[in-house]
Amino acid sequence: MAVSPKINRREHILQCLAQMLETSPGQRITTAKLASEVGVSEAALYRHFPSKARMFEGLIEFIEESLLSRINIIMDDEKDTMRRCQLVLQLLLIFAERNPGISRVLNGDALLGENERLRSRISTLFAKIETQLKQILREKTLREGKGFNLDEAILANLLLAFAEGRIAQFVRSEFKLKPTQHFDEQWRFIQHQLLQS
């Protein structure tokens, strides 16, 4: 497969890795298979990435930049607490749905047997998202004069667990059960429950 001059080799390797994660669910990706997919030798892969762990870190950096920058935009543009929560959850689910191979990284499925620091980085990413949700929920008291009856940390954890569960179903179903399926109805129910708490 020829690489257009506009796409650098490093990006192409990461795109091929994400594609292989999507088309080979449940299978471990070896550098030999990846090199074959990219159309280069394993040595050529290692000229761009010193290890397979660094390749996965490249994908994780893409995930972090994509999600956290968009969450910051949501925080700047939207002031309503419930709408912010909805948009953050929707962002996670749409991102996973549009990037099935990368959803395996988010879920941790693709990281089994890989370097522990990769799973740690994904855990840290989800902790940052949970902290954002907690902040959104805590600001409700400041913005609207009324908070929740339940601790915001517990509510933030519940919201994140919902999104992680939908992503896990997507991966487990080999990308057949879309994370956004029924989201609007589910969100209405969740929002109603949150406003009652």
Swiss-Prot record:
<comment type="similarity">
    <text>Belongs to the nucleoid occlusion factor SlmA family.</text>
</comment>
<comment type="function">
    <text>Required for nucleoid occlusion (NO) phenomenon, which prevents Z-ring formation and cell division over the nucleoid. Acts as a DNA-associated cell division inhibitor that binds simultaneously chromosomal DNA and FtsZ, and disrupts the assembly of FtsZ polymers. SlmA-DNA-binding sequences (SBS) are dispersed on non-Ter regions of the chromosome, preventing FtsZ polymerization at these regions.</text>
</comment>
<feature type="domain" description="HTH tetR-type">
    <location>
        <begin position="7"/>
        <end position="67"/>
    </location>
</feature>
<dbReference type="InterPro" id="IPR023769">
    <property type="entry name" value="NO_SlmA"/>
</dbReference>
<dbReference type="Pfam" id="PF22276">
    <property type="entry name" value="SlmA-like_C"/>
</dbReference>
<keyword id="KW-0238">DNA-binding</keyword>
<protein>
    <recommendedName>
        <fullName>Nucleoid occlusion factor SlmA</fullName>
    </recommendedName>
</protein>
<keyword id="KW-0132">Cell division</keyword>
<dbReference type="Pfam" id="PF00440">
    <property type="entry name" value="TetR_N"/>
</dbReference>
<dbReference type="InterPro" id="IPR050624">
    <property type="entry name" value="HTH-type_Tx_Regulator"/>
</dbReference>
<dbReference type="GO" id="GO:0010974">
    <property type="term" value="P:negative regulation of division septum assembly"/>
</dbReference>
<dbReference type="GO" id="GO:0043565">
    <property type="term" value="F:sequence-specific DNA binding"/>
</dbReference>
<dbReference type="GO" id="GO:0051301">
    <property type="term" value="P:cell division"/>
</dbReference>
<dbReference type="GO" id="GO:0005737">
    <property type="term" value="C:cytoplasm"/>
</dbReference>
<keyword id="KW-0131">Cell cycle</keyword>
<feature type="DNA-binding region" description="H-T-H motif">
    <location>
        <begin position="30"/>
        <end position="49"/>
    </location>
</feature>
<dbReference type="GO" id="GO:0043590">
    <property type="term" value="C:bacterial nucleoid"/>
</dbReference>
<dbReference type="InterPro" id="IPR009057">
    <property type="entry name" value="Homeodomain-like_sf"/>
</dbReference>
<dbReference type="InterPro" id="IPR001647">
    <property type="entry name" value="HTH_TetR"/>
</dbReference>
<dbReference type="InterPro" id="IPR054580">
    <property type="entry name" value="SlmA-like_C"/>
</dbReference>
<keyword id="KW-0963">Cytoplasm</keyword>
<comment type="subunit">
    <text>Homodimer. Interacts with FtsZ.</text>
</comment>
